[in-house]
Curated annotation (Swiss-Prot):
Lineage of source species: Eukaryota, Metazoa, Chordata, Craniata, Vertebrata
Effect after changing residue 239 to T: In PCH2D; abrogates enzyme activity
GO cellular component, one term: nucleus
Species in which this protein is naturally found: Homo sapiens
SUPFAM superfamilies linked to this entry: PLP-dependent transferases
Reactions catalysed: O-phospho-L-seryl-tRNA(Sec) + selenophosphate + H2O = L-selenocysteinyl-tRNA(Sec) + 2 phosphate
Name of protein: O-phosphoseryl-tRNA(Sec) selenium transferase
The protein's role, per its UniProt record: Converts O-phosphoseryl-tRNA(Sec) to selenocysteinyl-tRNA(Sec) required for selenoprotein biosynthesis.
Binding-site residues, pyridoxal 5'-phosphate: 75
Length: 501
């Protein structure tokens, strides 16, 4: 309702009441105006009524919601199901145009505005999380792996001779397949063991750059967030190598936005060397459904090139999800979640440490990994290979999700490449182990329930192992008794034969 509508309403209802309602509406509109003017995440989260008003105002700016609209094209925002239309708040046209995912659509001003605001809010949050000098970013409706592929395909046009991507090993399939899908040959750099941690082999990286030649290398593809005992790559040193040899640097920052340490590494890498783009998942960092990522970087023109590489229009669902989430939380709400995650990491670490010691195991010392933890499973692995994988199955059937058990010597072929010791990020890690992570949104009750169920599973596996050991002992003892009886029979037979003769 506008001013004229309220004035007309005063003829039907007491003007004092109408003016009060008008003031209430203005308070909602004031929040919306501040958002459009500043393009930053509000400090305090919005209530649902403000959010729904804002989304409704945007949606009616799209041509499919015009009163009396007549569409005669092949794509006019028609939706057969009213439920589907409501699910998307009647944003049907998606984002971008055929030549650029960030471009404005003439017949979808509301969706275009939604896209611009979302990208602006996400940029603000990335700065808040620790990468203060980021220049540009955009939300893309693909998960991390395909978003990395889009970055590699953009670099292809800038480096036509390149055929290799140097990749410090991380045993995660999608980031590996992102390079294969883009048509490049991954050059796997094995990690080095320093204490319990697996760290970047910088000498091997530089040696491979010199061996292959900088012109033949598309980029170095590094990683921040990862499963312990692997830790984030030495981003500063890798960024310096990239700057010295004029090689692009793409960072897989999948769930690193929630970690101040990961974001600091990216900021420092860009300060001392070269980082062209870093990619992060929406669902892992902002607690929204799977299917979106953020591509960000320090060179505005390069990020625009990546957005123009995306073919066709794109789904607005990931952008809408993260926009609603950030406006609901506000920057203070998101900062609170980051703080709670750090606290849960310390709590989870302490609880796993106590439990591991009770079973003669230990928490691996991985101080450079700010999200993931690992506990040894030596006592299980020494006795029976299947005991380690059995523990993982038991946890899963007891509704513990996210925990990973990593046995020794696992082999895995991914896109024609065979990895020894797959899941452990190295060919021969010294022991089997169990992973758990403290990610954004974790609560204390999650940790307590996990520790309780892990304790029960470890007891059950040990009890079964002990029973098998007893059974094996009994079988061995029976065989020994039979052999002794047979020998005694032979002695008695010989004695009888001697007496007879």
């Amino acid at each position: 309702m506008n001013r004229e509508s309220f004035a007309a309403g005063e003829r039907l209802v007491s003007p004092a009441y109408v003016r009060q309602g008008c003031e209430a509406r203005r308070s909602h509109e004031h929040l919306i105006r501040l958002l459009l003017e500043k393009g930053k995440c509000p400090e305090n989260g919005w209530d649902e009524s403000t959010l729904e008003l804002f989304l409704h105002e945007l949606a009616i700016m799209d041509s499919n919601n015009f009163l009396g609209n007549c569409g005669v094209g092949e794509r006019e925002g028609r939706v057969a199901s009213a439920l589907v239309a409501r699910r998307h708040y009647r944003f049907i046209h998606g984002i971008g145009r055929s030549g650029d995912i960030s471009a404005v659509q003439p017949k979808a001003a509301g969706s275009s505005l939604l896209n611009k605001i979302t990208n602006s809010l996400v940029l603000d949050i990335i700065k808040l999380a620790g990468v203060h000098t980021v220049a540009n970013c955009f939300v893309v409706p693909m998960a991390t792996g395909m978003s990395l592929t889009l970055c590699f395909l953009t670099l292809r046009h800038k480096r036509p001779k390149a055929k290799y991507i140097i990749w410090p090993r991380i045993d995660q399939k999608s980031c590996f397949k992102s390079m294969i899908t883009a048509g490049f040959e991954p050059v796997v750099i094995e990690n080095v063991l320093e204490g319990d941690e697996l760290r970047t082999d910088l000498k091997a990286v530089e040696a491979k750059v010199q061996e292959l030649g900088p012109d033949c290398i598309l980029c170095i593809h590094s990683t921040t967030s990862c499963f312990a005992p692997r830790v984030p790559d030495r981003l500063e040193e890798l960024a310096v190598i990239c700057a010295n040899y004029d090689i692009p640097h793409i960072v897989n920052n999948a769930y690193g936005v929630q970690s101040s340490k990961c974001m600091h590494l990216i900021q420092q890498g860009a300060r001392v060397g070269r980082i062209d783009a870093f990619v992060q998942s929406l669902d892992k960092n902002f607690m929204v459904p799977v299917g979106g990522a953020i591509i960000a970087g320090f060179n505005d023109s390069f990020i625009q090139e990546i957005s123009k590489m995306y073919p066709g229009r794109a789904s607005a669902s990931p952008s809408l999800d993260v926009l609603i989430t950030l406006l609901s939380l506000g920057s203070n709400g998101y900062k609170k979640l980051l703080k709670e995650r750090k606290e849960m990491f310390s709590y989870l670490s302490n609880q796993i440490k106590k439990l591991s010691e009770a079973y003669n195991e230990r928490l691996l010392h991985t101080p450079h990994n700010p999200i993931s933890l690992a506990m040894t499973l030596k006592t299980l692995d020494e006795h029976r290979d299947k005991a380690v994988t059995q523990l993982g199955s038991m946890l899963f059937t007891r509704q513990v999700s996210g925990a990973r058990v990593v046995p020794l010597g696992s082999m895995q072929t991914v896109s024609g490449y065979t990895f020894r010791g797959f899941m452990s990020h190295t060919n021969n890690y010294p022991c089997a182990y169990l992973n758990a992570a403290s990610a954004i949104g974790m609560k204390m009750q999650d940790v307590d329930l996990f520790i309780k169920r892990l304790d029960r599973c470890l007891k059950a596996v040990r009890k079964e192992r002990s029973k098998e050991s007893d059974d094996n002992y009994d079988k061995t003892e029976d065989v020994d008794i039979e052999e002794m009886a047979l020998k005694l029979d032979n002695v008695l037979l010989d004695t009888y034969q001697d007496a007879s003769s």
